[in-house]
């Protein structure tokens, strides 16, 4: 069998991102608050005491939060809150990343540890947990739930100590400070930060990815919100009833044992914890297109350009956690933030309660993946099944289970596979490709000698360009033919071996037959 795979690329020299109806800054959605009838189905939860700025210091909340033109917590308020917690708790360390946002804003984060560990020097035999919020700037319960978690840990010292016996935690509450400032989904440059995890078009994405790769977490969580008022049904009179939607990473190049741990242990516990808090949940979904009259919902996909899967491809347990909030301004904000907090706490508590199983399963999964000779998955499909989904009737606020077609990815089914290359060869004229791989934490060796020998290569036999820009590029559909050939590459070429922990990120980036490669 041929040992190496030659990377050949089509380069597209394109200008800036082009998207209709976007301006520079303040790309805000219209606000459609729940009616009094619908709002009655989302009451405040008795006994809720959230320890985050929007609730402990309500005077700091901007007026625009109530009408959907601002988030509830300005950068300086958030930073002051985090600094005060760090001053009062020796196990909390306040940091500012050594990079800035596209408009020059800071990235404060908290490192929580009971030892003298750090991002670059973590504790041995402890779980490393990465928690992030605020990826989309108009989803304020995402970062607020992270701040509420920090406040909850500070207020419950025994619980915090119990967690930190088993884990070190990095909390990046605000991934997209420019988006939060403009109260818009996008980065300042109007790129979607949650679609940039493979192509790495923006320096901000690369900087955060490098921090993530250095920390190399066992567990990661990405906090978001979903649209509250989207209607369905023949009369357009039903909406999602859930407070929370969540999903594990689904890409089939993540070790199967890690994926099963996510679904069988973490997801099941999370559902129970959400219900115990008096809240409602369902799996994360998007709307599908169907030729029938039946509603088709698509379970969270396997696409690597999404943060959940991109993080998971570093062989860790990852959850996307979404709360019901886009489009309703500050309505139900306590309940929304509580929903995010419950999910984050569930993940932490599940990991601690099952520490040996979680730690050993992930570490074994990393070793198994690193040494695997199994085929890699280039494309997959989602089997469609019948099930019900929790809905709410907007005319009377009745809750009911609505029959749907459900395209499931638990698990997805592999369609196109190929034998796992031992390595990829990259000519010295493509150092920018190598730099992107290194952002992922993928190691590339620079060869001090010329390479002469057999490789597998893909000859492109046809190319079809899309008619529109997508996130700054024109996407391309190619047909290829696999050929074996002898090549000569000069010294200074790069060898990317696949017996490394983050190799799956090389697979999805370099294999042209995956969905969104370089």
UniProtKB/Swiss-Prot annotation:
Coiled-coil ranges per UniProt: none
SUPFAM superfamilies xrefs: Zn-dependent exopeptidases
CDD domains: M14-like (cd06242)
PROSITE patterns: PEPTIDASE_M14
Keywords carried by this UniProt record: Carboxypeptidase, Glycoprotein, Hydrolase, Protease, Secreted, Signal, Virulence
UniProt-listed Enzyme Commission number(s): 3.4.17.-
GO CC annotation terms, alphabetical: extracellular region
One GO molecular-function entry: zinc ion binding
GO biological process: proteolysis
PANTHER family tied to this protein: INACTIVE METALLOCARBOXYPEPTIDASE ECM14 (PTHR11705:SF83), PROTEASE FAMILY M14 CARBOXYPEPTIDASE A,B (PTHR11705)
Protein name: Probable carboxypeptidase 2
Species per Swiss-Prot/TrEMBL record: Trichophyton verrucosum (strain HKI 0517)
């Amino acid at each position: 069998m041929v040992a190496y795979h030659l990377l050949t690329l089509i380069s597209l020299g394109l200008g800036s991102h082009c998207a209709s109806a976007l301006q520079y800054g303040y790309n805000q959605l219209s606000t459609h608050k729940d009616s009094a009838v619908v709002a009655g189905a989302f009451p405040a939860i008795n006994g809720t005491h959230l320890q985050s700025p929007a609730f402990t210091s309500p005077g700091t909340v901007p007026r625009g939060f109530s009408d959907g033109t601002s988030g509830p917590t300005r950068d300086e308020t958030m930073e002051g809150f985090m600094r005060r917690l760090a001053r009062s708790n020796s196990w909390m360390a306040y940091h500012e990343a050594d990079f800035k946002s596209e408009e020059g804003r800071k990235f404060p984060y908290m490192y929580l540890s009971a030892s003298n560990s750090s991002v670059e020097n973590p504790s041995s035999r402890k779980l490393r947990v990465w928690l992030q919020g605020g990826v989309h700037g108009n989803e304020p319960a995402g970062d607020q739930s992270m701040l509420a978690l920090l406040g909850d840990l500070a207020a419950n010292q025994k619980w915090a100590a119990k967690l930190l016996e088993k884990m070190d935690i990095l909390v990046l509450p605000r991934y997209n400070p420019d988006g939060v400032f403009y109260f818009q989904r996008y980065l300042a440059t109007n790129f979607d930060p949650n679609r940039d995890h493979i192509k790495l078009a923006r320096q901000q994405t690369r900087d955060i990815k490098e921090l993530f790769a250095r920390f190399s977490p066992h567990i990661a969580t990405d906090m978001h919100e979903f649209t509250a008022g989207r209607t369905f049904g023949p009369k357009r009179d039903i909406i999602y009833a859930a407070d929370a939607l969540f999903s594990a990473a689904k890409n089939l190049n993540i070790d199967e044992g890690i994926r099963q741990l996510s679904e069988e242990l973490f997801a099941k516990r999370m559902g129970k914890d959400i219900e115990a808090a008096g809240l409602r949940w369902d799996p994360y979904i998007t709307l599908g297109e169907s030729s029938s009259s039946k509603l088709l919902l698509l379970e969270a996909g396997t696409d690597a350009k999404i943060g959940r899967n991109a993080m998971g491809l570093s062989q860790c347990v990852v959850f996307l956690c979404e709360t019901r909030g886009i489009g309703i301004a500050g309505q139900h904000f306590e309940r929304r933030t509580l929903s995010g907090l419950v999910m984050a706490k569930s993940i932490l508590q599940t990991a601690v309660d099952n520490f040996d199983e979680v730690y050993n399963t992930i570490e074994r999964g990393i070793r198994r993946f690193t040494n695997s000779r199994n085929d890699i998955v280039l494309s997959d499909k989602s089997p469609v099944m019948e099930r019900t989904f929790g809905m709410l009737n907007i005319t009377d606020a009745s809750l009911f289970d609505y029959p749907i077609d459900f395209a499931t990815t638990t698990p997805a089914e592999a369609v196109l596979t190929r034998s796992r290359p031992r390595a990829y060869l990259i000519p010295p004229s493509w150092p920018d490709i190598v730099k992107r791989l290194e952002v992922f934490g993928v190691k590339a060796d620079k060869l001090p000698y010329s390479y002469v020998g057999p490789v597998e290569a893909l000859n492109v036999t046809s190319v079809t360009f899309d008619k529109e820009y997508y996130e700054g590029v024109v996407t391309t559909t190619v047909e290829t033919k696999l050929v074996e050939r002898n090549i000569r590459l000069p010294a200074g070429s790069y060898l990317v071996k696949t017996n490394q922990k983050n190799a799956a990120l090389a697979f999805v980036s370099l294999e042209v037959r995956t969905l969104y490669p370089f």
